[in-house]
């Protein structure tokens, strides 16, 4: 069977090597419009605290764990000169997370559950879509350690797609800009909270660095939530969640190392702040992140066959994460 014709949305202004390049302008637009006063605040930070305008965009066809004289890995950072930097491979990774997790939750979790509740098939499950999302997720996770080019012909991507693929591609694009925006706001907060000044002035110990990171998370969350307008609320919430949960696949441990709080602690801190209802899909997506993490590293978590809601499942999983930490 012939595949539907794919059309490229690449324009001459899209610089870079990977398909994620087509969302460069979306990233900047969302960042500048984080909330009604953000652009004014960022200009004040440039004038008064030395934030460097613009964002450095590194283009290296290398894995996320690649390092050189400019950075220790291809994850976002703000440097000693207060310039925020992002990397093309990391952006690709985050888009993959946004697409795969939304498709897998919608097609492999939510729709089957609705069918069971209705006692009949009210939703047709697209198994091909699930399969392609799983393949894409496998590719995305591989980028942590090994770089290979994105197979635009066979894997979903934001640059070349058919009209049949538009629904989930566009949804992923929206989630992606929110996820990256949370990460950019986190780096922005490090400048605003004078963390960079402190680190450049004096030795800052591990515990204080973790306090800095929590403060940056909290400020980034605050900035993002101030941008809610009734239409983008769910996208903002899910974007922040994906930005945090995507860190799970780097290690079988949720440890944040010497500088960051543990990943599970950061996720719970965010969910506590937005306090979703028990049946909010965000609990199911958070649980799905942990289920795939469990499968990836063979952690042997126990997954109950009957639950009241996804919030219960999430906290059941979280307890197993905490128990694992106590034993290690």
Model-derived features: positions:
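Peri-catalytic and regulatory segments of divalent metal-dependent proteins
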Residues: 4-181, 188, 193-197
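Short helix/loop segments within enzyme catalytic domains
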Residues: 25-44, 180, 196, 200-258
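Generic structural motif recognizing short loop/turn segments at the entrances and edges of beta-strands
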Residues: 51-71, 80-82, 206, 236-244, ...
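Serine/threonine-rich low-complexity intrinsically disordered regions
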Residues: 52, 59-61, 126, 157, ...
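Divalent metal-coordination and catalytic microenvironments
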Residues: 86, 216, 262
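Long, well-structured alpha-helical subdomains associated
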Residues: 225-328
């Amino acid at each position: 069977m012939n595949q539907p014709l794919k059309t490229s949305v690449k324009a001459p202004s899209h610089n870079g090597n990977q398909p994620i390049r087509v969302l460069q302008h979306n990233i900047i637009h969302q960042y500048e419009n984080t909330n009604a006063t953000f652009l004014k605040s960022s200009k004040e930070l440039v004038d008064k605290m030395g934030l460097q305008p613009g964002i450095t965009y590194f283009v290296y066809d290398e894995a996320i764990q690649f390092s050189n004289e400019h950075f220790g890995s291809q994850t976002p950072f703000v440097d000693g000169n207060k310039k925020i930097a992002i990397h093309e491979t990391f952006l690709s990774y985050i888009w993959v997370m946004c697409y795969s997790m939304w498709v897998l939750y919608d097609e492999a979790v939510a729709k089957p559950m609705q069918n069971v509740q209705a006692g009949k098939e009210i939703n047709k499950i697209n198994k091909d879509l699930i399969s392609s999302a799983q393949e894409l997720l496998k590719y995305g996770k591989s980028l942590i350690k090994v770089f290979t080019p994105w197979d635009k012909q066979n894997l979903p991507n934001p640059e070349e797609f058919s009209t049949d693929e538009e629904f989930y591609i566009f949804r992923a694009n929206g989630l992606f800009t929110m996820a990256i925006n949370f990460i950019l706001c986190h780096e922005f907060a490090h400048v605003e909270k004078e963390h960079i000044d402190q680190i450049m002035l004096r030795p800052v110990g591990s515990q204080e660095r973790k306090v800095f990171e929590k403060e940056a998370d909290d400020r980034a969350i605050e900035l993002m939530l101030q941008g809610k307008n009734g239409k983008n609320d769910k996208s903002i919430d899910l974007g922040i969640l994906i930005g945090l949960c995507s860190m799970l696949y780097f290690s079988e441990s949720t440890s944040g190392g010497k500088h960051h709080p543990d990943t599970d602690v950061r996720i719970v801190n965010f969910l506590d702040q937005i306090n979703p209802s028990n049946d909010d899909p965000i609990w199911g997506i958070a649980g799905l992140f942990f289920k795939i993490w469990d499968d990836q590293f063979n952690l042997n978590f126990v997954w109950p066959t009957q639950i009241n809601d996804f919030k219960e499942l999430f906290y059941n999983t979280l307890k197993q994460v905490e128990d694992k930490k106590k034993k290690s």
